[in-house]
Amino acid sequence: MNDKLYAYPMTADNGYFLYYDKSVLSEDDVKSMDTLLAKADASGKKFMMSLNDAWYIYSFYAGAGLKATLADDGVNTVCNWNEAPGADVTQAILDLSTQSAFKSGADADIVSGIKGGSCCAAISGPRIAGTAEESWGESYAATKLPTCTLNGVLVQMASGSGYKLVCVNPHTSNV
């Protein structure tokens, strides 16, 4: 910031993915949210993600080209979700929430659904990967987020990303 080093990235492992059970869903099924939901519904299973968490619903807004980011001043945030495509995104989220094959839930709910066999796909971060792999065994898979339909147009959902930083002491002689 302002040409000064305050920290550098140590990891970039705080994104999220689509985890799925290959015994229920094929690689092609999970490319589209519409197909994923139809196949999950036909199998009597659920697709899960948290809709009450801006971290995860960002994926819909980012797919529409909207942003929530740090302002140029490095202090304030900028969010343009209220622009024209934002209404389409909000409608797509509302439409998803009414699907019989969809269930909103936090990670603990998703883990419970995977372990209990009711969940065949979920959007979450790396912290549920072990549970999904253990529960689904050879049928475990993970991939990028699916496309979703916004006002009749397919858009690619996008993951947020987070970074762990190592801070730098500006007073040290080693900088």
Regions found by a protein language model. Give the residues of each.
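A ligand-binding cleft/hinge motif common to bilobed small-molecule-binding domains
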Residues: 126-139
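Short, well-ordered surface patches within globular domains
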Residues: 29-39
